[in-house]
Structures are given as C-alpha cells and as structure tokens.
Design a protein with these regions (language model features):
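Catalytic cores of nucleotide-sugar-dependent glycosyltransferases that transfer UDP/GDP/TDP-activated
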Residues: 1-356
Length: 356
C-alpha cells in the first residue's frame, strides 16, 4: 500500500507536544515500511522524522490540545489552521493517483467528517478516549459511514465512546521498536512518572505516592502546566520529586530502565499508555490505576499491579510488593505482543480491510 499519514496538529513531530501519538506515528512509519509499504507523512513545520522518511511539512497555526478543553467547549479553529492546511494538502495528494489510503492520526473532527473530500479511503487511528461532544459526533459520523474505518488502541478507550461505537471499531493496541530499549535487570530504588505535566495525568497523586513511599520519584515529560506542578509541590513538601524534562527515546529508556517501577496515576481514560510498554521493555514493572488502556497491558502480579483508581495508598502498597515481580517477564510480554512488527502487522491488516 501507498499510505499518507496525517499527523497531529497540536505540535511538530519530535516536540513532545503530541504526547504518545508521536511515538505511535514514528513506530508505524518504520514498521509499515519494513513490511514493504510506502509511507509519506504530512506534519507541521518543524517536525523531525527518521532519515529516509518522506515528509511534507506544512505551515500554519497549531491547535490547542483537546484534553485541555471542557467537554462542551466548542473547539476553536485558529486562523491559518495547520490542520486545515495539512488536510488541504492531503486531499490534493489523494487525487494524484500515487496513493492508496490516508491514515489519520489527528484527534480533530475535520478529517472524520470530511473524509469524502479525499479520492481514496481514509482510516482513522484514534489517539485518545472520549473528550468532547464534538469528537464523539465526529467519530460516530465516520463509523456509520464505514464501520471498518476507525481503529482504537484499547477496549477501554473504545468503550469511552459508548457501547455502540465500541462494537464497531477495530482494536489494534500499540507497539514499539524493541531494539531501542535496553533490558536492565538490576534497578535502583527510585520510581518513575512519565507523562506531560498536566492535571489529567495525576501529578498530585504522583507527589502523594512519593511522600507515602519515601522514595525518589523522577518525573519525565513536557512541562505543559507549571501551576499543576507547583501546587503539588506545595501540598507535599516532603516528597522527593525531581523533574527531569522531556527526553529523547534513547535517553529516556536509559533513565527509565534504572527505575524500580513506573507509576501511572492518570485521572482520565488513557487510550493505551505507550509509556507502559516502554517501561516493560526495559524490565520495569508498571503500577497503574484501573482506568483506561494501561490496565489492559499490565498482567496483575506478573508485570506489575493494577489498583483502584485514585487510591494512592494502594499504589504505595504495590510498591512494597515489587520484589515479587520478575523483570524478565516484563520484557517478555512486550516481545510477544507489543513489538513494532506485531503492531504494524495488525495495522496493515486493518488498513487492507478499510481499502477493500
């Protein structure tokens, strides 16, 4: 297949502003190319991709991330929108005769409701759960137009859009390039928190866990909302939490791999949680709230622990049981199900079905 990948409009690839969708897109570009497909990426100006990747960089104003808006807040399309400009370029490319399908990564209504403007099929890989009334309507529009055209990363994510939508979408999970992650058998005692520094990611809960366990917590990710960090630091003055910034995959995996555990204390429905499989690939157990995709990834008692949502004491209690986890089992789970090749294979099969 000759595939056009439409990137997220919230930031350039490589900036970290797009969150997990950036890793997903990079992984699929490599994986699909390895399977013999031709991939062209359409992304905002300033995007960085792997060498030999064909990319069209498009200018325009970036969009506000959907997770920062209230559910009923109408989205604001900025003047000279980068998404509008990227979509215009995608529709032009679709008429060239050089492509077979569009793979949309943008969590925005435009590609979902305007897919008929393209001369080739459009497939949508939804990166987040239900966050707004408009996106719910947009996803429903696409699903009812073509029941095969929407895929999601987890069953929990699909259920967030309601049972009818959940029954009509394809679940493809996710994957990573295992060669980029070193397995580390002997960790130190620190905990890791890897996420955008924002309210829905549970920054306050992370500080609370650091206080309860008395362990050092290293936080990695884009500083999206400094006030959330400052509020948590004031509330938990005895927490030893070190902000390590947004790191490249190579540096992050080395730092993450030394951790005793990754904690995932999110307050929203994580669509999947790529960082969970990144941690597991390094041999790091994952302690997660039973909310969203991460709870489907973690094998409770084998690769980590799944605890009740919003229960920081349960997270701290799970830290005390980390000695029961064999780190090699964590790596094995990723090798079996979440490799780049396995993920690309699932997505390629789905795209072939959409294109029929």
């Amino acid at each position: 297949m000759r595939i056009i990948c439409l990137s997220t409009p919230v930031g350039p690839l490589g900036s970290g502003l797009g969150g997990g969708v950036e890793l997903t897109l990079r992984t699929l570009v490599r994986g699909l190319s390895t399977l013999g497909h031709t991939v062209t990426v359409v992304a905002p100006v300033g995007s960085h991709v792997a060498p030999m990747t064909t990319i069209e960089r498009v200018g325009g104003a970036l969009h506000v991330p959907s997770q920062t808006l209230d559910r009923s807040t109408p989205p604001v399309v900025p003047d000279d929108s980068v998404l509008v400009n990227m979509w215009r370029r995608v529709t032009e490319m679709s008429r060239s005769g050089n492509f077979d399908i569009v793979l949309n990564f943008a969590y925005d209504a435009l590609p979902f409701v305007s897919s008929q403007e393209c001369a080739i099929p459009v497939a949508h890989l939804v990166s987040m759960g239900s966050l707004s009334d408009e996106m719910d309507r947009a996803v429903a529009t696409a699903v009812y137009r073509s029941s095969r055209c929407v895929a999601m990363h987890s069953h929990a994510q699909a259920r967030s859009f309601g049972p009818e939508i959940a029954g009509r979408v394809t679940v493809v999970a996710s994957g990573i390039d295992l060669s980029a992650y070193d397995y580390i058998e002997a960790p130190d005692t620190s905990l890791a928190f890897v996420a955008r520094i924002s309210r829905e990611k549970g920054v306050r809960d992370a500080f609370a866990v650091a206080t309860l366990t008395g362990r050092v917590l290293n936080a990695f990710g884009v500083m999206e909302d400094r006030s959330v960090w400052d509020d948590a630091a004031r509330e938990f003055p005895n927490a030893t939490v070190e902000y390590r910034g947004f790191l490249t995959t190579d540096v992050l995996q080395r730092e993450l791999g030394r951790s005793a555990a990754l904690i995932m204390v999110h307050h929203w429905v994580e669509a999947f949680g790529n960082v969970a499989i990144e941690a597991l690939a390094c041999g790091v157990p994952v302690i997660t709230y039973d909310r969203g995709g991460p709870a489907e990834i973690v094998h409770h008692g084998r690769t980590g622990f799944v605890v009740p949502p919003d229960d920081v004491s349960a997270v701290a209690g799970a830290v005390d049981r980390l000695g029961t986890i064999q780190r090699r089992d964590c790596r094995s789970v990723v090798e079996d199900r979440y490799s780049e090749q396995a993920f690309a294979g699932r997505v390629a099969a789905w795209l072939a079905a959409v294109g029929r």
